[in-house]
């Protein structure tokens, strides 16, 4: 008997009831909070175009073209001036975004790889958390998408005109222009989705990937424009390592007359290079009426070119102008369709609770160093556009915090209030989106693929001021001071006055290799 006359059994039973009451209250509170969370969890649209260089977005301050719809995202969100990739090539960049892991960890090192879809991905994490998930447009990972309730993707690189799409495993040809069709499929899915759930949509455009086939309404856009030629267009690479002289991505010498420059319909040069079939397969996707419209648009410029008999620097500049017009025409359709998708969100009252990310799989050369394409750790391909807007995100801000596509998965999960797996290798930049400090002090890069364009394999590190690149199969180094040499024209490696910086950067590079578990010849870093 208890001293107050109450039995111990009675006290135990009363404590049991008390504990149960607290437990029921806690469960009720948890259910209530979860329900509120379900209603308030943000929708997320991840927009990624293919090879869209930051130079071709007017919000970045360049005068090449106007992108009003992408610019509006920047006006309503945060624009990053220092967003970079880990491996500047299409498929690997996508795999990094999906996994939050470097290429040597996720297994997709180059465009000849096949993505292991059984591994953990951000789409699976969103789906498991109750989000409805979809991916439309460019995929480029060979294996079928996993972790998506719906997918509708172009096979491989896809085609611009009357492309094939694979919808949940069923392949069919769809009439129309690929950039518009990708948006059609995205909007159609948004219309039909389960509206009781938040959604996570990956919306990936093929454009403006090579070979830059514009939408017919833009065939004559920029016809009267002469674009400024970059001041290092005729770069002789004398101050760089031998890697720069061995590449095959120069506008002057490596663009194909039919495939790239649309100088078919005399394709003897392409036959010699074995590319005539590539051009014909693209052109023959058009209907007869589409071919006629195309010929009427392009034949006059082909005739002018044939009569001009250009050579040397004049020919190189003509190719540059042709390339820029075609590339920027494709960008114009991308911007139009960003506007279409944003208009849909607003018309359906989804804009207030949807986070929108706009980026590219990497940067792209628009004549800098005389190049097209990507791959290098030099700024134009290493750096990528990044704009983020949505609830809780600062508006109209620009930041120079250094972030990387390695951070995207963690940032998306953080924005949705979801747990971040400990094996991801990035760092959420949500603090930056809220106007606080964040990002990285140093970034690690590793490029593996040297088959196409003959760009040597390399690793490197970038800090706020310096960049160190090691072409490890050549055992050649480059060091740049990005404050005094933004164009990366003067290799400082081996100069006595920079020996201390070399050693510091090598030590940091070795540290990053250890952190990310990349064991590429670490002994040579000593």
Regions found by a protein language model. Name each.
Residues 1-40:
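Bacterial Sec-dependent N-terminal signal peptides
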Residues 17, 35-472, 476-477, 486-526:
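Formylglycine-dependent sulfatase
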Residues 483:
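Residues forming the ATP-binding cleft of Hanks-type serine/threonine protein kinase domains
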């Amino acid at each position: 008997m208890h001293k107050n006359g109450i039995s111990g059994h009675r006290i135990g039973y009363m404590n049991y009831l008390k504990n149960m009451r607290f437990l029921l209250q806690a469960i009720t509170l948890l259910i209530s909070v979860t329900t509120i969370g379900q209603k308030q969890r943000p929708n997320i649209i991840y927009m990624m175009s293919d090879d869209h260089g930051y130079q071709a977005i007017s919000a970045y301050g360049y005068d090449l073209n106007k992108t009003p719809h992408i610019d509006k995202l920047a006006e309503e969100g945060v624009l990053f001036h220092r967003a970079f990739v880990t491996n500047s090539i299409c498929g690997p960049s996508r795999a990094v975004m999906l996994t939050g892991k470097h290429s040597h960890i996720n297994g997709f090192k180059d465009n000849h790889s096949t993505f292991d879809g059984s591994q953990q991905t951000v789409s699976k994490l969103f789906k498991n958390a109750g989000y409805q998930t979809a991916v439309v447009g460019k995929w480029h990972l060979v294996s079928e998408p996993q972790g998506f309730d719906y997918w509708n993707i172009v096979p491989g690189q896809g085609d611009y005109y009357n492309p094939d799409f694979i919808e949940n495993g069923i392949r069919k040809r769809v009439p129309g222009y690929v950039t518009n069709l990708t948006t059609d499929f995205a909007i159609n899915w948004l219309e039909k989705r389960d509206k009781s759930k938040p959604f996570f949509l990956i919306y990936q455009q093929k454009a403006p990937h090579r070979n830059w086939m514009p939408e017919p309404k833009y065939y004559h856009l920029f016809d009267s424009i002469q674009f400024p030629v970059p001041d290092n267009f005729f770069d002789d690479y004398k101050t760089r390592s031998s890697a720069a002289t061995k590449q095959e991505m120069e506008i002057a010498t490596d663009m194909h007359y039919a495939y790239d420059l649309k100088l078919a319909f005399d394709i003897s040069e392409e036959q010699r290079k074995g590319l005539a079939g590539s051009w014909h397969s693209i052109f023959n996707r058009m209907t007869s009426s589409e071919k006629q419209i195309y010929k009427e648009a392009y034949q006059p410029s082909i005739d002018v070119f044939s009569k001009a008999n250009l050579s040397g620097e004049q020919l190189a500049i003509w190719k540059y102008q042709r390339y820029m017009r075609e590339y920027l025409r494709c960008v114009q359709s991308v911007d139009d369709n960003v506007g279409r998708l944003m208009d849909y969100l607003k018309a359906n009252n989804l804009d207030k609770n949807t986070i929108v990310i706009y980026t590219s799989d990497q940067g792209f050369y628009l004549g800098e160093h005389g190049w097209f394409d990507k791959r290098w750790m030099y700024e134009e391909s290493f750096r990528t556009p990044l704009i983020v807007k949505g609830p809780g995100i600062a508006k109209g801000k620009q930041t120079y915090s250094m972030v990387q596509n390695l951070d995207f998965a963690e940032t998306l999960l953080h924005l949705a209030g979801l747990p971040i797996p400990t094996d991801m290798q990035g760092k959420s930049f949500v603090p930056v989106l809220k106007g606080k400090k964040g990002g990285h002090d140093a970034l690690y890069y590793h490029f593996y693929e040297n088959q196409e364009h003959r760009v040597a394999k390399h690793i490197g590190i970038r800090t706020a001021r310096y960049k160190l690149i090691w072409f490890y199969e050549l055992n050649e180094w480059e060091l740049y001071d990005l404050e005094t040499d933004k164009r990366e024209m003067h290799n400082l490696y081996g100069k006595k006055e920079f020996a201390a910086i070399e050693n510091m950067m090598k030590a940091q590079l070795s540290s990053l290799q250890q952190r990310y578990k990349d064991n590429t010849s670490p002994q040579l870093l000593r």
